[in-house]
Amino acid sequence: ATNPAAGGYLIPEIYLDQIIELLYSKTVIFELGAQKVPMANGNLNIPKMTGGARATWGGEARKIAKTQPTYGNIRLSAKRLEAIVPQTRELLMSTNYSADQLFANDLTRRMELGLDFGAMFGKGGEFQPLGVFTDKEVEHVDAKTLSNEDLADSNGKITADFPVFVRSKVLAKNVDDNKLGWAFNSVLEGYLMNLKTTTGAYIYRDEMNTGKLLGFPYRVSNQITTDTTGLTELAFGNWADLLVGEQMGLETYTTLDGSWVDEEGNQHNAFEENLAATRALMYVDIAARHKESFLHVKNIKAF
């Protein structure tokens, strides 16, 4: 509080040797039960039965009807999740904050979030996995167009009956309920927790305080967004049917002489600019064993 010229320069400033960490979204897929499978050569084929035989009733001396199972294939091929983080050598040498460890922890967390995002929202194709929320073979429900006021109105504002409807649609497909779970964001979590009976009693709050909804666990990720009009989305399903093929898990490498191009298209060289650059890589792919194990709901009005 002393004026610098009146002696303030003589009062040393104290810095705590800690840094306030960044607030991250939560990851959800592995917490809900997604499974890692090895992908040694960068690809993996998983045969699957798409249709079964059929048993019929018959009579004496009658021909037995022939039925034939059908088969398909799930193919995983490695896709690269990547990041490069440069730091100046002066920063690494001059700080007491263990800046290298801070950067490493941040990079690891970012890669975990990138994998989670790909599992939910990946667009598919050569360079991205296909996510549960975007896979056209996963059943999709639009909360705005249900034409059933007992479940949701035309704006997508859902009722307390809606989660029961979602659960029932998935279970009707004979889905294994061993790892069924919900994924939605904190805004929708709050909306569901605030649903009340006509007498003012909270319907789901006590159960949701234990981390479950209708008997199944839920996880919150704010990578699932809510737009400015209050619309958001959720997924419900058997997350054990979500396979993460892994050719190589997280690898980090730090160099003093690498080069890279930044987001603005400028070329950088670590040696010339006295930088240290840390690169992180994963080689993975993601697929659902059974597409019918999941249900995605969009256009839910959360506020």
Model-derived segments and spans:
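Acidic/polar, low-complexity extended loops/arms that serve as protein-protein interfaces
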Residues: 1-179, 193-205, 211, 218-220, ...
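Sequence/fold signature of self-assembling virion shell proteins
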Residues: 72-77, 101-108, 157, 187, ...
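Short, conserved beta-strand edge motifs with alternating hydrophobic and charged residues
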Residues: 181-185
